[in-house]
UniProtKB/Swiss-Prot annotation:
Gene3D superfamilies: BRCT domain. This is Pescadillo homolog. Keywords: Nucleus, Ribosome biogenesis, rRNA processing. The lineage of its organism: Eukaryota, Metazoa, Ecdysozoa, Nematoda, Chromadorea. The keyword Nucleus applies. It comes from the Eukaryota. It comes from Caenorhabditis elegans. One of its GO terms (cellular component) is nucleoplasm. Coiled coil: none annotated. Required for maturation of ribosomal RNAs and formation of the large ribosomal subunit. Residues 309-398 form the BRCT domain. Signal peptide: none annotated. It holds the Pfam family Pescadillo_N. It is found in: Nucleus, Nucleolus; Nucleus, Nucleoplasm.
Length: 531
């Protein structure tokens, strides 16, 4: 009897969810401040399963949040800082109108500032959870580091992005944890293995960017603000783990005044010089196997071998970069492999005519070539890292058409189109490609040709043909028929619940096969036109 007279919309989705308008009213915040708060705290909207019930009978489109999330936000101390800042702006406008310079200066000195340190610790209770969220943080900070400063993009924020991203790249170099890289239209993709976690990020290409006017940066700025605080914590912990000074230093003893100079900062953040390590910390020789525990012995041994080959790939090699080459990207990869890098006016004081240079990286044809060094195009450095070894330089010489640059982030599956060059690359890396080769779909030209049967002309009039003995079917034919019948029987046994999934899988397989055939035909046609 009690449930019979229960009031409507007092349980279920109607209570579990709250609309954005209700949330703004509860928190007494503007939409702009509410968005900032949600981004900083990691709260995002949810789509209710029963939208009409959550909306209390209405069918209007609304943005919904969990009620427990809004109650959680109501106790956040940073809300008071948002309100203090509104009061500060009101006072600022008042004093500007009165032109009271002394009071205005004093007000600027007491400007309300909030710290995100507590929120970072709250959102990432363990260091591993922070590393797992590094992909977006690094990609966004690297993008902002390339942008010019505007009214929204403050100069201090862009400088912080440049500083923190350079510090992270220095850590990757010193720990030699870079594993893969790929050049794309969007930028250069990198993948590093830090404490057993794979971190992948993209860095835009080095080029001058104009002021971007068609993008609303107000939301992105809040993300960057949080990521700057997070990267500061992560970089400090990573530097402590391998015994580096933080902030990074080149020498053992550096004065504070010297560290603030632009010349010193240029040397530190150019990535060309190694960082100084603390004497009180003893670094283990090889910590790589510790990060790979829990895997089978073969995979573990393979990963250890790959990591070792990457660390010593460019050992003893001295690279000189021409001015047209992307210096940061090449320095990052070469120093990760144990090489030495220099360029004109660089911090390593390496001259172009030095006899110590073993590799000269150029992207333009050169008139004068030295005999005692190898000349390569920038792609050679990227391909060497992905191949885990120094590749032959003949195909990468200046003016030569470069080989295809394959992505190491895609995994080859049986039945996909895999170019011949990629198969050769996998074979050279010691991988078994026989299954991949066998599963590549064949075009009509590659199928075995059957001899055309010439039918004898029927003689006119009544004719009785001489009886002939038919040959027995081959074993392969019987096997094919039996396999086809077995497959049909198994398909009939699939339940109705899973039939749709099975048919969609079959359609996807056929589509992928057709796409692979089309790509193979295109590659064949391209080779024919080149020849």
């Amino acid at each position: 009897m009690k449930d019979r007279f229960k009031q409507k919309y007092t349980a279920g989705a109607a209570v579990a969810y709250m609309s954005r308008k209700q949330a703004l009213k509860k928190l007494q915040l503007t939409l702009k401040d509410f968005r900032r708060l949600c981004i900083i705290k990691g709260i995002y909207p949810h789509e209710p399963a029963h939208k009409k019930q959550a909306n209390k009978g209405s069918t209007a489109n609304k943005v919904f949040y969990y009620r427990k999330d809004i109650n959680f936000l109501a106790h956040e101390p940073i809300i008071n800082k948002f309100r203090d800042y509104k009061v500060f702006l009101r006072k600022l406008n008042h004093l500007k109108a009165k032109k009271e310079e002394d009071k205005l200066k004093k007000l600027y000195e007491n400007k309300p500032v909030y710290s995100l340190d507590t929120i970072v610790k709250e959102r990432f209770p363990t260091f591993g959870s922070a590393l797992r969220d590094m992909d977006d943080a690094l990609s966004l900070c690297f993008t902002f580091a390339m942008l010019p400063h505007t009214r929204v993009l403050k100069e201090g924020m862009i400088d912080s992005c440049r500083k923190l991203t350079a510090e992270f790249m220095h850590y990757v170099i010193e720990s030699q944890s870079l594993r893969n890289t790929f050049i794309s239209i969007k930028g250069i993709y990198y993948q590093a293995e830090v404490h057993g976690e794979k971190i992948t990020w993209v860095v835009p290409h080095e080029r001058g960017l104009p002021h971007v006017t068609d993008v609303d940066f107000t939301v992105l700025v809040t993300f960057v603000e949080f990521y700057i605080a997070m990267l500061g914590f992560v970089n400090f912990k990573l530097y402590q783990d391998i015994g580096l000074f933080y902030p990074p230093q080149i020498g053992q003893v550096v004065k504070t005044d010297e560290m603030e100079t632009e010349e010193y900062k240029e040397k530190v953040y150019s990535l060309a010089k190694p960082l100084a390590k603390r004497k009180d910390v003893e670094q283990a020789e090889d910590d790589e196997p510790l990060d790979l525990l829990g895997e089978d012995s073969d995979a573990l041994a393979q990963k250890v071998r790959e990591a070792k080959s990457i660390k010593t790939m460019f050992k003893g090699c001295v690279f000189y970069l021409n001015r047209e080459c992307p210096k940061e990207a090449l320095t990052f990869i070469i120093r990760n492999g144990g090489g030495i890098v220099g360029w004109e006016g660089g911090p390593t004081d390496l001259k172009a005519d030095s006899k110590n240079i073993s590799h000269h990286v150029v992207d333009r044809p050169m008139d004068k070539l030295e005999v005692n060094r190898l000349y390569v195009q920038p792609q050679w450095v990227f391909d060497c890292l992905n191949a885990r070894r120094k590749l032959p330089t003949e195909r990468y010489m200046p003016g030569v058409a470069l080989p295809p640059h394959f992505s190491p982030f895609t995994s080859e599956k049986a039945g996909d189109y895999i170019p011949f060059e990629r198969l050769e690359e996998l074979r050279s890396m010691g991988k078994d490609v026989s299954d991949l080769e066998a599963a590549i779909p064949k075009t009509m030209d590659e199928l075995p040709m059957r001899r055309k049967e010439v039918k004898p002309e029927k003689p006119k009039g009544i004719h009785i043909a001489v009886g002939q003995m038919h040959k027995k079917s081959k074993e392969k034919f019987h096997e094919t028929v039996e396999k086809g019948q077995e497959l049909k029987m198994r398909e009939l046994m699939i339940s109705k619940k899973h039939q749709r999934v099975y048919h969609s899988m079959k359609t996807t397989f056929k589509r992928n096969r057709n796409d692979a055939l089309k790509l193979k035909k295109k590659a064949k046609l391209a080779k024919a036109t080149e020849a």
